[in-house]
Amino acid sequence: MRIYPAIDLMGGKAVRLYRGQKEKVKVYGDPVEIASRFTELVDKIHVVDLDGAFTGKPQNLDVVKEIIEETGLKVQVGGGFRSYESIAKAYEIGAENVIIGTKAFDLEFLEKITDNFDGITVSLDARGGKIAVKGWLEESSLKVGEAYEMLREYVDRFIYTSIERDGTLTGIESIERFWKDEEFIYAGGVSSVDDVLKLRRVGFSGAIVGKALYESEVSLKELLEVLEC
């Protein structure tokens, strides 16, 4: 199991939102400097372009490029990737994985990008067990398991985000495994060693950790050490 430190970008800065609400934002500073803190412990991080998620088009790829070039870290990046051109640009600047959410349910588009790019990752963002789209602003009628069954023939790498938990430090929901052999990464309120161990028991291949690291609720070193046991 892997730990992916998270950096959320807004206006070129590293920020965190409370439950995905852009009105409730806390600024943490220079994203390149923050990314550099992780280089001794991990080789890959999770980056979300929040401006892109809300506008439908990536706005901070220059910052993502700088992170990659300055730190040497591998990056999985999401936020507003709803066109072939924006996805191509992300790979061009050095991203290892591009995360798509809203456009994943356009199966013709999904087939096209998975035919042309490796590492496409689908984010299943859930509120109340239902998939949320367009920067979490709209809720669909699809349940998470239904969305997974629809998309699994196209991709083998997923991120499951519990929106209610995102950035709230309240721990994880009770989740039963519904996926099979795919790489499944969890995001949303991971804030303790116990959370990470529970996710590993369920069968998640990774956990994305953001606010808990910034607020010193848990250290990256602690999480990595317990996973070695």
Swiss-Prot record:
Xref: HAMAP family: HisA
Name of the protein in its database record: 1-(5-phosphoribosyl)-5-[(5-phosphoribosylamino)methylideneamino] imidazole-4-carboxamide isomerase
Gene name per UniProt: hisA
MF (Gene Ontology): 1-(5-phosphoribosyl)-5-[(5-phosphoribosylamino)methylideneamino]imidazole-4-carboxamide isomerase activity
SUPFAM superfamilies assigned to the protein according to its UniProt record, in alphabetical order: Ribulose-phoshate binding barrel (SSF51366)
Subcellular localization, as worded in the UniProt entry: Cytoplasm
Species: Thermococcus onnurineus (strain NA1)
Gene Ontology cellular component terms for the protein in this record: cytoplasm
Catalysed transformations (reactions): 1-(5-phospho-beta-D-ribosyl)-5-[(5-phospho-beta-D-ribosylamino)methylideneamino]imidazole-4-carboxamide = 5-[(5-phospho-1-deoxy-D-ribulos-1-ylimino)methylamino]-1-(5-phospho-beta-D-ribosyl)imidazole-4-carboxamide
Annotated Gene3D superfamilies: Aldolase class I
Keyword list, A-Z: Amino-acid biosynthesis, Cytoplasm, Histidine biosynthesis, Isomerase
Recorded family membership: Belongs to the HisA/HisF family.
Annotated catalytic residues: 8, 125
Pathway: Amino-acid biosynthesis; L-histidine biosynthesis; L-histidine from 5-phospho-alpha-D-ribose 1-diphosphate: step 4/9
GO biological process entries: L-histidine biosynthetic process; L-tryptophan biosynthetic process
